[in-house]
Amino acid sequence: MTDPAPAVTGKPLRWLQLDGLVLLASALILFAATHQPWWLVPAVILLPDLFMLGYLRGTQVGAAVYNLGHAYPLPAAMSLAGAVWHHPLTLALGLLWLAHIGMDRLARYGLKYDVSFQHTHLGGPHPKETDARLPSDRAA
């Protein structure tokens, strides 16, 4: 298992949240350009969370599967494939997948460590200040 690093806090966290907001907004603007129906947004925006099912096999498998669905490479490749092959639905679905990731980052949900679902590179949705301290900083 991997020991989680301290949670990102302060200005770096705000920059990472801004990254998420920019990704979310950009993906939705590009989605609009695909001329796909807007009902797709609520229909599929949460589908990447199905990658949480990996946790049924334990925290190590769960973190790996979850991170596979919540990192940029797969949805970026899907979006690129849709654009290159002139397949608007594939492009739209890839963009909505990226929008989901942006939404998660904005809400402070990050990539998972394999110690538990709550330990992320962003410290979870509401990290406590004590989570941000290094183990050596904690009183013994």
Where are each of the predicted segments found?
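N-terminal membrane-targeting hydrophobic helices
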Residues: 1-140
